[in-house]
């Protein structure tokens, strides 16, 4: 399993945004992170997404525009 870290690209597996690509922008604690990307920026339980082996270069708490630019540059959006 890939590490849970800022910049890790993930796929949502549960909820209304299931199947969409997202990126971890902040780690809150051992159970929750903040995600953004092709999903609405929100807090998300670790059980609701699957991390991939891909990672984009982002700083902690990056803006939505920075996240979308990084995903677009990596060809993931």
From Swiss-Prot:
The keyword Ribonucleoprotein applies. GO terms for biological process: ribosomal large subunit biogenesis; translation. Keywords: Ribonucleoprotein, Ribosomal protein. Gene3D superfamilies: 2.30.30.30. GO terms for cellular component: cytosolic large ribosomal subunit. GO terms for molecular function: RNA binding; structural constituent of ribosome. Belongs to the eukaryotic ribosomal protein eL14 family. PANTHER family: 60S RIBOSOMAL PROTEIN L14, LARGE RIBOSOMAL SUBUNIT PROTEIN EL14. This is Large ribosomal subunit protein eL14. The gene is rpl14e.
């Amino acid at each position: 399993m890939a590490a849970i870290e800022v910049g890790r690209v993930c796929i949502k597996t549960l909820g209304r945004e299931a199947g969409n690509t997202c990126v971890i922008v902040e780690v809150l604690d051992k159970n929750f992170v903040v995600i953004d990307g092709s999903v609405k920026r929100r807090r998300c339980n670790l059980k609701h997404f699957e991390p991939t082996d891909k990672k984009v270069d982002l700083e902690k708490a990056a803006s939505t525009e920075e996240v979308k630019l990084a995903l677009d540059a990596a060809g993931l959006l």
